[in-house]
Amino acid sequence: MPKILWIKNNEPEVYARTYKFLTGSSFLAAKLTDNYVVDRFLGLASFNPLYDPKTWRPVPELCAPVCRPDQLAKVQEATDLAGYVTEAAAKETGLAPGTPVITGTDDSGAEAISAGVVEPGKMMIQFGSSIYMILGTRHLVDDERLWREQFIVPGLCDISAGTNTGGSLTKWYRDELFSDALEQEKKTGIDAYQLMLEGVDQVPPGSDGLITLPYFAGERTPVNDPLACGILFGLTISHTRRHLYRSALEGVAYSIQQQLRLMESHEDVSIDQIFAVGGGVNNALWMQIVADVTGREINTPDVTVGASYGDAMMAAVGVRHPGFENFSCLVQHIKTGTVYKPDFKKYKIYQKYQAIYDKLYDSTCELMHMMTEEQ
């Protein structure tokens, strides 16, 4: 909805000529089928509160300040057919005319499906440029520190949360503190991120008293503060760049743990299985740190194509392909790759640092805001 308002306020001519406001997946479906649909998961969440959550239809009085009701797409399930590939689309894409096209959804939702989030207690942690978490729940949770939606799977709700820096933080460290690793990558072909890990596993848990608050680009949940800043707490002259890098990996893990605990603080919410997905799972040390900080097993999938795999699964459900009659059938097609088991000795060490981490934002947010106001 904010994007529609931005177009309305900043590009009124474009707004006036707009036939439909669509998501990325809806746009592709429309180009392929000439039908304008959006899946329930995105429609009710991204366009909130323009659709009635019970009827899935636009509410005229709520749409009035934003757009006309007829400018919104029809809401249906992600696995419902959007239509079939038209002759014109077939010529442009090479797809066979008449190929069924499902409604589809966004990347994170599809990747959650590929990670088995098809029932309560199943969770995906997506390690991309940012960290995104989706946990299947039996009911909607009322907590302004977290997000909640009716999930893609009919009858399943979810809690979602996000840490604004994940892979983007490791990239910043690579570019600013490990430029020699980049140079070596050019010469040897060995990935710079792999080179950055040399010796980091020798730094003890807690990075010798160095805690990173990874709010380098503001923060989403649980603080929802675009003015939040990153902090290196406990930095001394004895720390090396290896300490700084490990502390960054730990800081993201502390953020994840803070949010997992917050989710499970709600009645009838439990985390029974975690699948980690995305580019960050290639960093085995990071995955082990997350397991040790959270005290939970972190599973990685055997198939790592992520959202595309989830899309393929939903397409199979949509056309009722044998063995894919419903979402429950998907579990048998999700195979586990590496499992990172927590070291509970390290978990106890991390609990001490977690307690400090949990207080860092509240202790400094006023100063953060003073700092950003001066810039």
Question: Which residues does each predicted region cover?
Answer:
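Gly/Ser/Thr-rich active-site cleft segment
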Residues: 1-106, 170, 214-217, 245, ...
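Glycine/Thr-rich phosphate-binding loops that ligate phosphate moieties of nucleotide
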Residues: 12-16, 35, 135-146, 150-375
